[in-house]
């Protein structure tokens, strides 16, 4: 059977692409290598309330807790408090990620998409240099699926892009190694997602505490791979928990480990092929969060697919509309935040403490790069030289 689009991966990016494409009349198939959508969970489970604007989730069962905002703790304990609308795409809800993924996939199927579980994509089908479908193994059966467009939504370890000639290799400098417990029997402020910074806490990254209830929270860590060594993330996470008065009595009910891309977005379009979500590196380089950009990018990809199907044109030039649109929608933010990441990596804990001191009492009317720079330099003029690259970005 031939499809307009075969989507490899049933995460938020893949299922959103399928949902919106099917809604516009495209014949769509999702391939999921695992036996269950949304499992295992590999996420801190925070997402901004802007997710509601995309209408991909019904009901509220996927919500574990509502957040009022975020608190950022400098190495010396200085705290910056931000309201949810100012705190970025990872603050608003803490979710049950397995239910979150299932709900988006269910919505895609309701709109007409098909879904195959236990189906591992093993390569691309080509006629000459033209991609015409996907090779896969469904349970123990080798199959070929014909499609005009293949969408790589296969996550941080994406192979689809490489098969099409896109360099998706991540350098250690652009990869976070992560570990997370879901702890119970703890004390936590249910209203806030907490982030802890410091070279001794999480080199090149941060520790997060995302409450899922009054005595349950996801407590995790991301460490930049170029600054890490085997077992470091887990060792530092255990140390943090053992020294935190509200967490040290906690007991784990779930553990997960993985990797998160924190580099710049990659090339996302070839003839007959698109990349979305983590496979496209649509992840905030500072926070490592990517749920909003995955859903948003999936919607833009779907609209491009629908247009291509209508025109019956699937070449790179036609599909490049997708890349142009995501760059305009959130690409500039990702590029800016990559520069911010590089600046933060160069800073000593002393400088991070100065940053927090500058911002702790600042009343943000808007959370813009320029407003942050003004607040920082206004209280600590010596920071100006360190922030010059950021100031240049803010004024261009």
Residue ranges and their predicted role:
Residues 306-396:
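C-terminal helical "tail/cap" subdomain of flavin- and related membrane-associated enzymes
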Residues 107-248:
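Predominantly flavin-linked oxidoreductase catalytic cores and closely associated redox partners
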Residues 6, 10, 20-42:
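Glycine-rich FAD pyrophosphate-binding loop
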Residues 123, 227-305:
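FAD/FMN-dependent oxidoreductases across multiple families
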Residues 78-100:
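Dinucleotide-binding Rossmann-like beta1-alpha1 core, especially the glycine-rich loop
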Residues 1-5:
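Extreme N-terminal starter segment of soluble prokaryotic enzymes
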């Amino acid at each position: 059977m031939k499809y307009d689009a075969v989507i490899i991966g049933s995460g938020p990016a893949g299922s959103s692409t399928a949902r919106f494409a099917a809604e516009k009349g495209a014949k769509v198939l999702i391939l999921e290598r695992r036996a269950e959508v949304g499992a295992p969970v590999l996420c801190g489970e925070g997402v901004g309330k802007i997710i509601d604007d995309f209408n991909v989730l019904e009901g509220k069962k996927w919500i574990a807790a509502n957040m009022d905002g975020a608190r950022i703790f400098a190495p010396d304990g200085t705290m910056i408090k931000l309201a949810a609308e100012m705190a970025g795409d990872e603050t608003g809800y803490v979710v049950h990620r397995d239910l979150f993924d299932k709900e988006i996939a269910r919505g895609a199927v309701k709109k007409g998409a098909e879904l195959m579980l236990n189906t591992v994509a093993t390569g691309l089908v080509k006629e000459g240099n033209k991609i015409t479908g996907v090779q896969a193994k469904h349970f123990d059966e080798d199959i070929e699926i014909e499609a005009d467009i293949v969408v790589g939504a296969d996550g941080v370890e994406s192979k689809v892009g490489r098969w099409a000639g896109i360099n998706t290799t991540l350098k250690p400098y652009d990869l976070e190694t992560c570990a997370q417990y879901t702890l119970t029997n703890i004390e936590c402020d249910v209203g806030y997602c907490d982030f802890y910074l410091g070279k001794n806490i999480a080199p090149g990254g941060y520790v997060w505490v995302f409450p899922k209830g009054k005595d349950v929270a996801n407590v995790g860590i991301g460490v930049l791979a170029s600054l890490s060594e085997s077992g470091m993330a887990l060792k530092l996470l255990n140390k943090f928990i053992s020294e935190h008065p509200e967490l040290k009595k906690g007991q784990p009910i779930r553990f997960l480990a993985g990797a998160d891309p924190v580099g710049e977005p990659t090339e996302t379009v070839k003839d007959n092929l698109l990349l979305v979500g983590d496979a496209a590196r649509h992840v905030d380089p500072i926070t490592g969060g990517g749920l909003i950009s995955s859903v948003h990018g999936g919607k833009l990809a779907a609209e491009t697919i629908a247009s291509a199907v209508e025109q019956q044109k699937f070449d790179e030039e036609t599909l490049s509309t997708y890349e142009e649109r995501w760059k305009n929608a959130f690409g500039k933010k990702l590029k800016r935040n990559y520069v911010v990441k590089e600046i933060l990596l160069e800073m000593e804990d002393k400088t991070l403490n100065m940053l927090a001191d500058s911002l702790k009492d600042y009343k943000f009317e808007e959370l813009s790069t320029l407003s942050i720079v003004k607040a920082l330099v206004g209280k600590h003029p010596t920071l100006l030289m360190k922030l010059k690259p950021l100031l240049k970005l803010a004024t261009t």
